[in-house]
Amino acid sequence: GTADVDLVIVHNQPVDEIREIIGMTPEVTLDIHHIEQSYYSPPRKVRKDPWIGSSLCFDPLLLYNKGHWFEFMQASVEAGFFSPEYVIHRSGLFSNEARLLFTELENQRNLGSSIYISSYLKIIEDGCNAVACLSGLPLTDRTLMKRFNEVAEAINREDLAPILYGLIL
């Protein structure tokens, strides 16, 4: 199997490097996100972010906390994270991106097969994450195929998983 370890480090000062990806073994990847503390204010902005908001709301493991900042921020973000307007907003971010990339896809056909295929797969990923955000958190590219069936079941659309597999195969 494979595993992703996501580590979010919140800094109280500007950061130079936003993201580091370190291959620990061929099967394990350490994905480190460096985020400035100011990004989390106001909390309603974080509720709209499918990646950062989800990192607070789906049982994160806290390694270090100074002054109860994390608990306060987590409670503030979770307070409205699952309200319909935020769920639809997060899903819409992925849906709109997939739609935009799809309209540009025909123009990329002449750029070469690797660019075209990469764009095609990104459209599928964004479409799947639009669905995933309706019931929970977005899926990483490494877990998308494995977990999409449960995402589709969560919104009572079991028919979506075979469609996804058909688009890939």
Where are each of the predicted segments found?
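Short secondary-structure boundary segments
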Residues: 1-9, 63-84, 123, 133-135, ...
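Conserved nucleotidyltransferase catalytic core and NTase-mimicking acidic/glycine-rich helix/loop elements
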Residues: 86-169
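Internal, well-ordered alpha/beta segment that forms a basic, Gly-enriched binding/recognition surface
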Residues: 37-104
